[in-house]
A protein has these predicted regions:
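Serine-hydrolase-like catalytic core of hydrolytic proteins
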Residues: 15-195
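Substrate-gating cap/lid region and adjacent catalytic-acid/histidine neighborhood
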Residues: 159, 167-168, 193, 197-215
């Protein structure tokens, strides 16, 4: 699960328990539920993108995200996706050089990579790579509409279900501040003079610096 900038309050956890652990920066992963490993089955494939905007959430955060019932009772395969979020997935470092030109879209690149993996491998789990439906709720719905507009995702899914959620503004909610202003302020907060030093900072320290300088 991608590390989270903010954790839920104890009261919130009592009302709606979440599963946000274990957390790690290397969070790109898939969960797959199927009732038969038959390469000839060609079952419809459902790919779930979790809510939480672009800052929080996980593919297994709620009990309702468990795909066992669909795999047992339905005739389809369920895949759920973890990807980079918040500053790991969407901090814009592009003003600081070619190396970072796609940094503000890393989370979406993870989603496309997940769909590519599904396209290339889901037949081994009994799925049909030409019958893939992506769906999501709240922030997950936003991701579905985004993926419909990303050229590199063309052909990796055939249908999309938006279960609430629409994208407006930038993923980190930086408002009018651009990448240069925010990242420069973060480096000042951390006492750095070179953007490459951000790559050496543990996530909690990086998130704390961002929280201090973000809108």
């Amino acid at each position: 699960v991608c590390p989270l900038q903010n954790q839920d309050t104890p009261n919130g956890e009592l009302m709606v328990p979440h599963r946000y652990w274990p957390q790690d920066e290397h969070c790109q992963s898939l969960n797959i539920w199927t009732n038969k490993l038959d390469p000839e089955a060609k079952k419809p494939v459902l790919v779930w993108f979790h809510g939480g905007g672009y800052a929080a959430g996980s593919s297994i955060e709620q009990v309702a995200y468990d795909g066992v019932s669909i795999a047992k009772k339905g005739d389809s395969i369920l895949v759920s996706v973890n990807h980079r979020l918040n500053i790991l997935g969407y901090l814009d470092l592009s003003p600081f050089g070619e190396k970072y030109k796609n940094s503000a879209n890393a989370g979406h690149a993870d989603m496309v990579a997940a769909l590519q993996w599904v396209h290339d491998n889901i037949a081994l789990f009994g799925g049909d790579p030409e019958n893939v439906t992506i769906f999501g709720q709240s922030g997950g719905g936003m991701k579905v509409t985004d993926l419909m507009q990303i050229p590199s995702a063309d052909g990796l899914f055939q249908k999309g279900l938006v279960m609430s959620g629409v994208m407006e503004g930038d993923p980190l909610g930086a408002g009018e501040k651009d990448g240069t202003e925010i990242v420069t302020a973060m480096m000042k907060e951390l006492g750095f003079d070179d953007v490459v030093q951000l790559e050496t900072v543990p996530y909690p320290q990086l998130a704390a610096a961002y929280a201090k300088v973000s809108p």
